[in-house]
Every structure is written in C-alpha cells, then in structure tokens.
Amino acid sequence: MTKSNIKGKLSFKSVSEQSAEMKILKNLQSRKIPDNELLENLGMFLSSKNLSRILCLDFLYKLQIKINGNIFDFGTRWGQNASLFSTLRGIYEPFNRHKRVFAFDTFSGFNKINKKDGKSRLMKVGNLKTSQDYPKFLQNHLDLIDSLNPISHIKKIWSIKEMHLKF
C-alpha cells in the first residue's frame, strides 16, 4: 500500500482504492434514488471497510450495555462515532434515560505536536480540524439523531467544544 494524496488530503489508501471511493461518492451525488428514500438506502454506498467499522462499534456498544455510566467520545472530529453510539443506544437501550453520549473535541485540529507523536505526515499543527461552524452543526445534527430515538424529550447527547485534558 502506498501513501498518496488526492486534492491535498492525507490518505494511506492505495490510488486505486481512492479512485474507487471517489466513483462511489460520485454515484451517491448523482444518485437516481429519490431524496425521501436515500437514508433507507445508504447501505448501497458502504464499503466493506466502512461497514466493518460500524459493526465494530456495535460490538463495543454491546460490551458495555450492562455497565452503568455514560459514553465519552474524545476527539470526535466529525461526530460519526457519537452519532452511531446514540443510534445504538436507541436500538439496544431505548428507554435507558441515564445512558448519555458526550462528544468532545477542540474542532481546531492539533494545536501542537510533541516529539512522542512521531513523524507521520498526519502529525502537523492544525491537521484534523473541522470547518469553522462545525461544532454548532454537529450539535444540531446529534439532536436530530436523538430525536428519532424513544423518549426523545430527554436530551441524551452532547457535543462539547474546547477539550483541555492533561495526562
């Protein structure tokens, strides 16, 4: 596998894999599926890697069902894990009003790099930042996802900006 860049984005995927993913993205963007049926058919656009990742999160969620407490997603970036955990909570613990999901991130990328981080091309100041208004978008989106779960009148998911943790 070679390290490669498409449009300046860091990727460790092969060129052929990136090309196939771009074609799938174009298929999604130019789909013949009506808007009102798109969400029910998103599986059409999932690769085995993406589905494996979702199934892994499903496995991890099932491991903690009998454990009291909340779910914390540190470094949430785009919020996919938090969104999936909220959805899984709605599936496996629909009436557990005490299980909450917290998504933490600075949303500004790496503010500094330590030599312990290594010399990967990923390790650059500002890398992994989101768009400027993303934290607000993410919270609104997570609220929408949660609104589709049972007992949606009780807030069960939060996106928290400016995570300052020292280890």
Would you name each region that the model predicts?
Residues 54-67:
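Conserved alpha-helix/loop element of class I SAM-dependent methyltransferases that forms part
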Residues 50-57, 82:
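Short alpha-helical patches at coil-to-helix transitions and adjacent helical residues
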Residues 21-48, 65, 70-167:
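S-adenosylmethionine/decaboxylated-SAM
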Residues 13-16, 61, 79, 86:
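A broadly tuned "polar low-complexity/structure-edge" signature
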Residues 1-23:
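N-terminal auxiliary segments of SAM/dcSAM-dependent transferases
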